[in-house]
Amino acid sequence: MPEESIALVVDNGSGMVKSGLAGDDAPKCVFPSIIGIPKMPNIMVGMEQKECYVGDEAQNKRGILTLKYPIEHGIVTNWDDMEKIWRHTFFNELRVSPEEHPVLLTEAPLNPKTNREKMTQIMFESFDVPAMYVSIQAILSLYASGRTTGIVLDSGDGVTHTVPIYEGYVLPHAINRTDMAGRDLTYYMMKLFTERGYTFTTTAEREIVRDIKEKLCYIALDYDEELKKSEERTEEVEEMYELPDGNLITVGSERFRCPEALFNPSLIGRECPGLHITAYQSIMKCDIDIRKELYNNIVLSGGTTMYNYIGERLTNEMTSLAPPSMKIKVIAPPERKYSVWIGGSILSSLSTFQKMWITKEEYDESGPSIVHRKCF
């Protein structure tokens, strides 16, 4: 592996793939982790129609496609589709040849072991990379925030997890993972719209709802108070949204009722604890001496933490759970949507990291299981 070859950093999330070159301060390309298959046969001869579309192209042609997500809850469910996404990332988006660059991939904590092994296998056997590494998403977010101690609350499209890290050491016994995140909120939003009389059912319409959710939703500081306000003074909560066909729809109390499920998952019929409780439980599983520092460094990361007022609400909730004199500090970096990728970019450009890569020789010698020995 030549010294000067720059690493490629690929953060393959359940909803979006963020990729770029190590050392950059933002990902070069971000596109949805979507594969689109045409619903109808092609009758126009000479039209360059593909068997499948990836990412933005699938998003743009979604009206005639059936959309699939190859990654669900952080776990790859369809490896053929995943390979298409990686192929698209390397050759069409980054325009690099993977056999010339080491590749850093990311994954959620407490993922099935087979998931990493298969990732490693595809990278070495299908893309012939010289070296690769798999890192846990939350650790990278902490790197990006410039800390070595803190509890990272990372919520993306498929997985929400809280990971306590002390002086750079991850405390694996205290990691909490919930398979409830952005995509579940999108489905909940679709259900709330049905109650209002708007029906969104197809996979293409689900993407419209995701856009409404991202643009208009916010977290209520006091949910009951906000509900009362939305019933008494409706106009204060309502916003208009223009659909792709030009029609306008009104979005009202759904704006805060949808993301409320993060703090109260029973709203969508889930038995898991809310964000604030998982963070609290993670801290309580740690040694009593380090809890104070964790309470003081709660770092948010991931696209599902982008809602307005989430920092204030989390601070309030944590304050009511923590001991009375405890100082709570929630850090919500403005670039947190991409902080996992930024952390990966920092990590893979460190000179001390260069000896951590899994090389092609090591892979040929030990097979895919090498990934458990070399990557945390």
Swiss-Prot record:
Keyword line: ATP-binding, Cytoplasm, Cytoskeleton, Hydrolase, Methylation, Nucleotide-binding
GO molecular function: ATP binding; ATP hydrolysis activity
EC number: 3.6.4.-
GO cellular component: cytoplasm; cytoskeleton
Catalytic reaction annotation: ATP + H2O = ADP + phosphate + H(+)
Record text on activity regulation: ATP hydrolysis occurs in the polymeric state. Unlike for mammalian actin, ATP hydrolysis occurs also in the monomeric form and the release of inorganic phosphate (Pi) is more efficient.
InterPro entries, sorted: Actin (IPR004000), Actin/actin-like_CS (IPR020902), Actin_CS (IPR004001), ATPase_NBD (IPR043129)
Pfam family, one: Actin
Residues annotated with Tele-methylhistidine modification: 73
Protein's job: Actin is a highly conserved protein that polymerizes to produce filaments that form cross-linked networks in the cytoplasm. Polymerizes into longer and more stable actin filaments compared to ACT1/actin-1. Has ATPase activity. ATP hydrolysis leads to the formation of a stable intermediate ADP-inorganic phosphate (Pi) actin, which is followed by the release of Pi. ATP hydrolysis affects filament stability; ADP-bound actin depolymerizes much faster than ATP- or ADP-Pi-bound actin.
Protein name in the entry: Actin-2
Organism: Plasmodium berghei (strain Anka)
Gene name tied to this protein: ACT2
